[in-house]
Amino acid sequence: MNSTSLFLFSLLLLLVTGAIGKKTKEKFLQSEETVRESFSMGSRGHMSRSSEPEVFVRPQDSIGDEASEEMSSSSSSRRRSKIISSSSDGSNMEGESSYSKRKKSRFSQDALE
């Protein structure tokens, strides 16, 4: 009797697990299809009717503006890196470890002697 109930219980568990797995697989396929549809949609939220890719053309005068903006941002980043690289105690603010600070100070003391 005990082995029969164990067999029936394992059979029931197998059926329940299979049913749960099947439902999970169906939900996964549905969500995968939804993701595919959302990626195939156009940037405006509707399906693109033409098979040609959209090409964005930039006006000529905006190219020069962008170049000057890029140059000003690079000079400001240079200034920022100079500020970051030195602080009041001589260590950098980028996260120099205390171990490397001690190594540097020991090396400089050894070089002076």
Swiss-Prot record:
Domain of life of the organism encoding this protein = Eukaryota
Q: In which organism is this protein found?
A: Mus musculus
Per the record, its GO cellular-component terms are:
extracellular region
Query: What is the induction note for this entry?
Result: By testosterone.
Signal peptide annotation: 1-21
Q: What is this protein called?
A: Seminal vesicle secretory protein 4
The yes or no answer to whether the keyword Transferase is present is: no
Q: In which tissues is it expressed?
A: Testis.
Region Disordered, as annotated, extends over: 31-113
- Record family assignment: Belongs to the SVP2/SVP5/SVP6 family.
